[in-house]
């Protein structure tokens, strides 16, 4: 078990994971609540905060590797006009291909295991209109569509093959 996760869960029982992305400032607890609006404007302790915090989609399952949603979805803010470093600002570094090659992994620590995700796509979409990719447990056909859309929308070829047998992590900002 991850001691940092246990400590964060002691402070706030809504803490379900830790996310770490080497090469970035992203190394933080992940919250989850019964709706996606709760942590939109709250910090990782649950205190009201305009900047919010990193949180998992309320429908995502995060029990263990076998039971984790096939599309684990985390949300975090990006504030480019402020001096704020608590969200997903550094994800924009992945717009540079070399950065993605040098930092290809994202780690998610759960209560009983550490998951490793390899970056296969980085792309920008309109979250209001392009909601297809925000499905935690799509059937195989819908999941294949998500994978196809992610690969087609990416300007780079990371050389990572992803199939419907895999689990993916979607970071939305």
Where is each model-derived feature located?
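Solvent-exposed, non-transmembrane regions of membrane-associated and secreted proteins
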Residues: 1-173
């Amino acid at each position: 078990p991850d001691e940092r996760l246990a400590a964060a869960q002691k402070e706030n029982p809504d803490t379900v994971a830790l996310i770490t992305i080497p090469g970035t400032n992203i190394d933080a607890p992940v919250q989850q609540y019964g709706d996606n609006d709760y942590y939109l404007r709250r910090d990782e302790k649950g205190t009201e905060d305009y900047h919010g915090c990193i949180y998992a989609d309320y429908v995502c399952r995060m029990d263990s590797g076998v039971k984790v949603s096939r599309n684990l979805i985390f949300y975090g803010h990006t504030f480019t006009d402020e001096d704020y470093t608590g969200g997903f600002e550094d994800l924009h570094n992945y717009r540079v291909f070399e950065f993605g090659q040098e930092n290809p992994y994202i780690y998610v620590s759960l209560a009983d295991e550490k998951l490793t995700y390899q970056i296969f796509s980085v792309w920008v979409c309109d979250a209001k209109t392009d909601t297809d990719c925000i499905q935690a447990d799509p059937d195989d056909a819908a999941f294949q569509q998500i994978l196809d859309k992610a690969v087609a929308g990416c300007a780079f070829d990371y050389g990572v093959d992803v199939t419907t047998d895999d689990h993916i992590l979607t970071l939305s900002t």
